[in-house]
Amino acid sequence: MTFSGVLIANRGEIAIRIARAAQDLGLRTVAVYSQDDAASLHTQVADEAVQLEGLGARAYLNIEGVIAAAQASGCDAIHPGYGFLSEQAEFATACANAGIKFIGPTAEHLGLFGDKARAREAAIAANVPVLQGIDRAVTLAEAQAFFGQHPGGIIIKALAGGGGRGTRAVTNAADLAEIFARCQSEAKAAFGIEDVYVEVFLPKAKHIEVQIIGDEHGSITHLGERECSAQRRNQKVVEIAPAPALDEELRQRMIEAAVRFAQAQNYQSLGTFEFLLDTSGSGSEFVFIEANARLQVEHTVTEEVTGVDLVQSQIRVAGGESLSDLDLADPATPRGFAIQARVNLETLGADGSVLPSAGTLTAYEPPSGPGVRVDGFGYNGYQTSTAFDSLLAKVIVSTKADNFAAACAKAGRALTEFRIEGLSANTDFLQNILSHTDFVEASIHTRWVDENVQTLASPSGQRNRYVSAQQGEPGDGFAGARVDTSDPLALFAHDAEMKNRRSEVVQEAAVITGPDGSVGVSSPIQGTTVSVDAAVGDEVRAGQQLAVVEAMKMEHVIAADFDGIVRQVTM
């Protein structure tokens, strides 16, 4: 089947990735954008672009609007990317009803794997091990009772969707009610459904996932595994293919479990079957946690070690081609290592707290060279928005040799070459992860980043391997400068002094005028107010939640710095 056009129902780096893959197959591509996202680079990379009604993520989640855009632009296929509508069975059904091919799994598979409780039941039926848990949406009372049975800790998860949103661990019974409410709120905002379920929490586990692809003729194969144990608050930050230091016999058992599960469901398109490997004991027990019925953010590392273009493969399978047509009847053998580091626009506090960084990029120069790939959408002058995810780019490095330490060093060096100015990014944080002995020795687990976040959030100490604008601009401080001509290093000393002066940026906090003797508490970020949890006259304690603000798809709690009485609430 040849598509007349492919509409990409997404934005940013993944929309660009899909557009290029489709264009290389000779397909016409159409981008969509919300009214406040017209300046995003994906609108220029695609052959055409159509504006959606509405602002922010809501526009990209409007099924009728996306279908109408496809019909108006003459597209008979839609690629959803990841996030947004990618895992909504309702959207796949709407595409079918409109005579448009949904490039992804069937609506039935989306419905099954989009309901994490049903997916657990299906895993058990396929003889795939799962964590102890409750296979349905639970109430707060049920979650509290489950915690009572497992006081070592439980994890609350959104019943729909993934990406770490609506997912939090509970290790203290006193925190359960607040965390439960936060998970429900995040799940509702991200997926439109507030339902959550619970499982036993594994504090020392590796996250291993298997890449599956199935065609419409009943054939299914795998493309190896990835390790995604480097996570901050259940969100992946660094991914690896293949998983280093994984016992070969264990690797094969996990892959066989994923393939068996996919075959039991006659799975079609790309899919990722995810497992936790318990490292607290023998390190040989694994459990299924979820299947993501879509293209993954980290598909890139699998591409680099197998040489298979997963996006093109997904499009071709949707067009009716078989795995044999794609030369994928037999699993591809990985070569070397690939590492992906997610570069986010954010500011990290000394305590590891994270705030999204919004504003204008004044410089954007990604690294390059052999074995260095960057999937991003930044450019000089791009103005970001808190309405969307903070991911700016993915730096992917690959090596041909089976030397994981060398791959780590290469990834760290590539990040020092990434010039991002005007906004804060997490490159130092990523460099610290990649250079840490635990990471290089492949001995980390899913809580490792959170346990070491204060160390990882500190400046990396690595030298930036790029020239900033200030180093070469006219009037940079040399003209008319007085230096000691007898000192051969005087110019360098003067240059360093001028750069230090430029870097001294004064941050102006919001000024809140309140009653005499009161101290204002302001939101440290721009965003949408989710809730105000204090009223005039309330007595509050230090650390007590006062409000919740949502920005870049994550909720941030604003807490009191000290005990006091609320005298005024302003918005």
Task: Identify the residue ranges that each predicted region occupies.
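Short, flexible turn/loop "capping" segments at secondary-structure junctions
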Residues: 158-161, 234-235, 385-391, 522
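Structured functional modules or segments
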Residues: 513-571
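A basic, amphipathic helix-loop patch mediating RNA/tRNA/ribosome contacts
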Residues: 8, 22, 403-414, 543, ...
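Catalytic cores of soluble metabolic enzymes centered on carboxylation/carboxyl-transfer
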Residues: 258, 300-515
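N-terminal beta-alpha lobe that positions the nucleotide/phosphoryl donor
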Residues: 1-273, 277-296
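Conserved beta-strand residues within beta-sheet cores
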Residues: 30, 153, 195, 207-209, ...
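A short, polar/charged loop-to-alpha-helix boundary motif
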Residues: 230-237, 297-305, 422, 553
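Short amphipathic alpha-helical segments
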Residues: 4, 165-166, 242, 389-395, ...
